[in-house]
From Swiss-Prot:
Protein name: Chitin synthase 4
Gene3D superfamilies (alphabetical): Spore Coat Polysaccharide Biosynthesis Protein SpsA, Chain A
Organism: Gibberella zeae (strain ATCC MYA-4620 / CBS 123657 / FGSC 9075 / NRRL 31084 / PH-1) (Wheat head blight fungus)
InterPro entries membership: Chitin_synth, CHS4-like_dom, Nucleotide-diphossugar_trans
Extent of Basic residues compositional bias: 182-196
Pfam families: Chitin_synth_2, CHS4
């Protein structure tokens, strides 16, 4: 918890303060995620005054030094070293400058702002960094929240009417403080300073979204909305935005419906009736490739067409001597004198009628022929005379104008390639070259090319028969022949589709391929993760069975009841039997593992395979690299180092300083850093339990499960944060009283605990809140279900948000929401890591944790977040920390949540398989890419800080200023922001992590299991899923804009997130379309195969997942129940959620005594007076505390005295249980 030293104020290396050398406070110069530090040329030599021998002497030292710049580049992008004579030149780079511009939209903007205030200069000599002195360089000040340096200034927020922060106005009017020679702060007179003015809401131009929502809801003016129960502007704005979102959802649904049903009908249209050749029945007759229905026709009176007895003309199909049913009559209506004019000429002695222009009356004999091409050329029987060729104007008008074709005759390519035929294709038309044989050479003359093409024995005919000759006949002469053939020997068209129909099929098959690929890839990658990837995160052994099937059966039995305890397996690793795992490993090693050449403290711990073990805060402290001789983080390789607290302010090097007072005499001793009972280095972990209105039974269940996990108690601490003085519905005690009843051996008597101020996540006067800190050890109670031999000693801290005295008489005093509870701890961790100014509450948290754990809070690098109604499986914490330690790139993970009340009602029954699929299919697939989009707040884990690069370098993750700043946003105005911050804060934290660190991983650990109770009433489920669905939609909207996620284009997490977003929005339409397809497939014939196959795959693959992953066969039954409830999941719940977009309350869940369900949001009332909140660094708080108490580091008040030897506190001798053969 230290910052590097500012230049020009350093002391000798062996005299540096122990407090400023935390390994977590260093950052690599080339750290990608921090932006890095740049070298400073011509840096001055580092000198500083001599440090006093005691703390009382040290405060008299005045170090009036100026802070040199952090880097050559200032936050605004301008060089700090470039003078007038030194122009700024831009170097060549493959990266565009706007990519490196750190503006307010940059994901690391706030981190750079904090890094800019770090007092450090990078080393240009290769030596260790020079750190700020603990005694002399810290300014002594009694400044409140609105005074002092900018590094600890309150988080700036947007201001709205009724939410004025006095700090902003006061800061603008206060003069800059001057420091006198005596070291005191001299301020100018404030007599003439103007009082702070109220900051009104600034008028901003309407955005495109606001204009769109206003257009959509133009029919609902403000006065009508006031009459309908929406009097405030915020309610009206939320309702208008809701209607805007609903309109967009309806548009998307309409687009999906159009693509599903209307696109094909639009672009392809109703297909024209088509008849395949040789399938034209007897009621039709073919003319030039078109079938005409002549079954009810009558030929008008003409020569050779006698009238029937009924006075009507004969039917040409049945009444004539030659039956023409189903035949081709193209020669009866020949297309003459068109493109064939000049090619087909009159022969000598021909009796074909002609005129002066050379036009011919007919080309072929006016006879019919069979459609299959089997008719032979008849050269003996005379054909009909001219009247059979229909050469009169009346007959041609009757055919071309009055007669309508019934269907086109088409040929398939198999028909065209039939060797018995002589067919070719030109421009989609089928031409029968055998019809060229019907030319009578005595009547007409034809070109030799015609004779060559019709001859099956010619080379040309063999080359073109059965093929498409469109491209081949592009020459001028052949093209002329082909166009002539289209008029005289066309017998049909090739079996083709229109461009629209082709486009429709392309869209259909592309969508099919996309859906199948997404569904298939998700399934197979989920299987790969379950079988292979997740196993590399598992520890070598835990307290539970290592057999996978046996363990799954044990978990299923355990999850049947929320209060059922797991089976205890004898002989396995257990936190109550120290050294049980070490005994076998120690005896198995016959040869010595160290020698006189081994490094002291074992800084280079390696696994059995020779690979370097992962870095943790505890493991790195065994190395002296980059640590000053008297570093507070220099721990010995034994258990004594955890509670060793000598005088921090003596002039001689001693072990690290602690808070004034004492370290609890019952602190859990720290094991040696190389003690690895589970096969990986242990990491210190905080277990955060957020409580609101839960009762004693629920909280006891959660804390019992955490306290009895097999992870060593020396490396875990329970932190319970009670969100206000709340009494749950039907409870006799308030939640804070319940939590305090589970705490014993208090470091400070409960009646002596005072409330301390902090900045809450709220608006107006509620930004000032107060809370009490209680520290001690977990109390299992007199009637505990946990056996006495398993009741371990676990350090515990309870934070009770009690509110300010002004709200003591109001309902829910101190209540600020779950996000505020999380921010209390997250902001505290950020202040600890960056050594920033902290509030009084955070100072008490720091000291309280140190007293009950024996180590600095800076040691904690992992945080487990659990709701107060969740029970954790005994080895779950071990599995989760194992994954964190083995893969430093993992920044967040979650386990599987089981349902404990499966059989309470039909409402709980339909949720069982939904929980299973969401974990083992969705989260397993996302884990392959390290991009789990939702870490459930009821059971998840985040990394506070991560080791980076070389030894002793750490970067903030959850404690990153960008995470804390965005997550603690106190002014939410738009509907989108309210759904993010007020309904789905847990999911939004996951989104923030992915958005800030897109290259790091968030995974699912299936071995880590918890169980919880789910809603057993439909209205409660409806309210819960309304919050979850709306939160999911708005978080996916945020994630879809993150461009740096894994993959590219369609093969990326960004694309998968987009598909999930669209899929969530169209759920009601999708289930309606599904039922429509199923019903039409049953009624109509043939059924729609492709949609039914897709439906079967989507619904059936999860069942196959149950079989492949070897889970309980009972999940098949739960799957069938889930399928029956699909209309509820996909229609009722989403539709209700969409209509409730503007409802920001928690509905029927978590109701308190006397509470009525109402729409909620951030309430703006009063003004925030920041002067009531004191902000100082830990060193300043500690100095003031010691000044008031008169404690100046006397040897008798600190464990260990002032010498170089140490004495253990009462009841704690050397910790021999970690080594069984010690």
């Amino acid at each position: 918890m230290s910052l590097p030293e500012r230049p020009g104020a350093s002391q000798a290396y062996n005299q540096r303060s122990v407090y400023r050398n935390s390994p977590s406070r260093r950052s690599r110069p080339v750290d990608i995620e921090t932006g890095g530090y740049h070298a400073v040329d011509n840096q001055a030599s580092h000198q500083r005054g001599k440090s006093g021998s005691s703390f009382a002497e040290s405060i008299g030292i005045n170090s009036n030094t100026e802070s040199m710049p952090l880097s050559p580049t200032s936050p605004d992008g301008q060089s700090r070293h470039a003078g007038p004579e030194q122009p700024i030149s831009r170097k060549r780079s493959l990266i565009r400058p706007e990519r490196n511009r750190i503006d307010r939209d940059h994901r690391n903007y706030h981190y750079h702002k904090h890094a800019a205030h770090m007092n450090v200069l990078p080393s240009s000599t290769g030596n260790d960094p020079i750190y700020e002195d603990f005694e002399a360089s810290t300014e002594r000040t009694n400044s409140n929240y609105n005074e002092g340096g900018s590094d600890g200034s309150p988080r700036q927020r947007r201001t709205v009417s009724g939410d004025h922060e006095k700090s902003a106005a006061v800061a603008s009017t206060l003069p800059t403080p001057d420091r006198t020679k005596s070291g005191k702060i001299k301020r100018k007179s404030r007599r003439h300073s103007k009082p702070p003015k109220r900051i009104e809401e600034q008028l901003r131009p309407p955005t495109f979204w606001n204009v769109y929502c206003a257009i959509v809801t133009f029919w609902a003016p403000g006065f009508i909305m006031k009459c309908c129960g929406m009097p405030t502007r915020a309610q009206q704005r939320a309702w208008r935005e809701k209607m805007g979102l609903i309109s967009i959802i309806l548009i998307i649904m309409a687009i999906v419906g159009f693509l599903t049903f209307g696109f094909t009908a639009t672009v392809c249209g109703a297909p024209q009736e088509r008849l395949r050749v040789n399938k034209v029945d007897g009621g039709n007759m073919i003319f030039h490739g078109v079938a005409y229905d002549l079954s009810e026709s009558h030929h008008p009176p003409a020569q050779g067409m006698p009238l029937r007895s009924d006075g009507l003309g004969p039917n040409v199909l049945y009444d004539l001597p030659e039956k023409n049913a189903g035949k081709d009559g193209s020669f009866l209506f020949q297309n003459v004198n068109g493109r064939c004019k000049g090619l087909i000429t009159l022969a000598k002695g021909s009796d074909v009628p002609t005129n002066d222009d050379g036009d011919l009356a007919w080309y072929f004999p006016c006879k019919t022929f069979n459609q299959d091409g089997s008719s032979k050329v008849n050269t003996t029987t005379p054909y009909y005379s001219g009247y059979g060729c229909h050469t009169t104007l009346d007959s041609r008008n009757a055919f071309y104008l009055d007669l309508k074709g019934a269907a086109d005759v088409y040929f398939t390519w198999d028909d065209i390639k039939n060797k018995s035929r002589n067919l070719v294709v030109y421009s989609g038309n089928v031409l029968d070259l055998d019809l060229l044989k019907w030319f009578n050479s005595t009547q007409v003359d034809i070109p030799e090319r015609f004779k060559e093409l019709r001859d099956k024995n010619s080379a040309v005919n063999k080359a073109i028969r059965g093929r498409d000759v469109t491209r081949m006949f592009q020459s001028s002469s052949d093209k002329k022949y082909a166009q002539c053939f289209e008029e005289i020997i066309k017998v049909g068209s090739v079996d083709t589709e229109t461009i629209g129909c082709i486009a429709s099929k392309i869209v259909l098959y592309c969508a099919l391929a996309l859906i199948l690929s997404v569904v298939g890839v998700r399934f197979f990658l989920a299987i790969i993760f379950q079988w292979f990837i997740c196993r590399k995160y598992a520890p070598t052994k835990t307290s539970q069975s290592s057999d996978r099937r046996k363990r799954n059966k044990q978990i299923e039995d355990w999850s049947e009841d929320i209060y059922r305890a797991p089976i205890r397996l004898p002989g396995d690793v257990g936190s109550t039997v120290y050294g049980s795992s070490d005994r076998s490993s120690k005896r198995a090693s016959f040869l010595p593992t160290t020698s006189r050449f081994s490094s002291v403290g074992g800084p280079d711990i390696r696994s059995q395979g020779g690979r370097r073990m992962p870095t943790t805060m505890a493991s790195q402290s065994t190395s002296n690299q980059l640590l000053t001789p008297n570093s507070m983080f220099k721990q010995g390789n034994d258990s004594r180092a955890s509670f060793l607290r000598t005088d921090p302010y003596s002039s001689t090097p001693t072990d690290g300083p602690g808070p004034a007072g004492f370290i609890h005499d019952a602190v859990v001793p720290q094991p040696p850093s190389d003690w690895m009972p589970f096969g990986f280095p242990l990491a210190h972990t905080m277990c955060l339990v957020t409580a609101y209105s839960e009762g004693e039974e629920g909280i006891r269940t959660t804390l019992d499960s955490i306290a009895t996990t097999d992870y060593p108690n020396s490396h875990k601490v329970i932190v319970v944060i009670c969100d206000g003085i709340i009494k749950g519905q039907g409870e006799t005690m308030s939640t804070p009283d319940v939590c305090l009843g589970m705490l014993k051996d208090h470091s400070i008597p409960p009646d002596m605990v005072e409330p301390f101020s902090y900045v809450a996540v709220a608006s107006g006067s509620k930004r000032h809140n107060m809370a009490k800190i209680y520290c001690g050890f977990y109390d299992y109670g007199k009637n505990s279900r946990i056996p006495a031999d398993r009741q371990q000693r676990v350090p515990m801290m309870v934070v009770v948000k009690c509110g300010t005295p002004d709200e003591a008489s109001k309902s829910k005093p101190g209540n600020r929401g779950k996000r505020d509870s999380q921010i209390i701890l997250m902001s505290f961790l950020q202040k600890v890591m960056f050594d920033e100014r902290m509030t009084e509450l955070e100072y008490e948290m720091f000291n309280g944790l140190w007293k009950v754990t024996g180590i600095s809070p800076d040691y904690y690098e992992i945080i487990l977040m659990v709701d107060a109604d969740t029970k954790v499986f005994p080895d779950s914490l071990t599995h989760m920390i194992s994954a964190m330690v083995k893969d430093p790139e993992i920044m967040g993970l979650c386990g599987e949540t089981k349902i404990a009340n499966k059989r309470d009602s039909w409402v709980t029954a339909i949720q069982v398989f939904e929980y299973f699929v969401s974990h083992h299919l969705a989260k397993s697939f996302e884990s392959v890419f390290g991009g789990v989009t939702c870490l459930p707040g009821c059971f998840c884990m985040y990394r506070i800080k991560a080791p980076k690069g070389g030894h002793n370098y750490w970067v903030p993750i959850l404690a990153n200023p960008d995470i804390v700043e965005h997550y603690s946003e106190n002014v939410v105005e738009t509907l989108h922001e309210k759904n993010l911050y007020l309904l789905g804060e847990d999911r939004f934290l996951t989104t923030l992590m992915l958005r800030t660190f897109p290259k790091r991983k968030q995974v699912f650990i299936p071995q880590a299991v918890c169980k919880t109770t789910v809603p057993d009433e439909f209205m409660v489920l409806l309210s819960q899923r309304r919050r979850w669905i709306n939160s999911t939609i708005h978080n996916l909207m945020e994630l879809v804009l993150v461009r740096d996620l894994c993959g590219t284009f369609c093969f990326s997490m960004q694309f998968i997130i987009f598909v999930e977003l669209v899929g969530t929005l169209v759920l009601p339409a999708a289930i309606a379309f599904t039922f429509y397809v199923v019903i039409t497939s049953i009624i109509n014939s043939p059924p729609q195969i492709i949609p039914l196959v897709l439906l079967g795959l989507i619904l059936g693959l999860p069942g196959l997942l149950v079989i492949i992953t070897a889970h309980s066969w009972s999940y098949i039954v739960w799957m069938l129940i889930y399928l029956l409830a699909l209309p509820i999941w996909n229609f009722v719940l989403p539709t209700y959620a969409f209509w409730k977009f503007d409802d920001f309350s928690w509905g029927e869940t978590r109701k308190t005594a006397g509470e009525k369900t109402k729409k909620a949001g951030l309430e703006y009332e009063g003004e925030f007076d920041s002067s009531k909140i004191t902000m100082k660094r830990w060193a300043e708080f500690e100095r003031d505390k010691r000044s008031r108490s008169g404690y100046w580091g006397s040897r008798e008040n600190v464990i260990g005295g002032g010498g170089q030897t140490w004495t253990s506190p009462p009841g704690h001798q050397y910790n021999e249980e970690y080594y069984s053969d010690a």
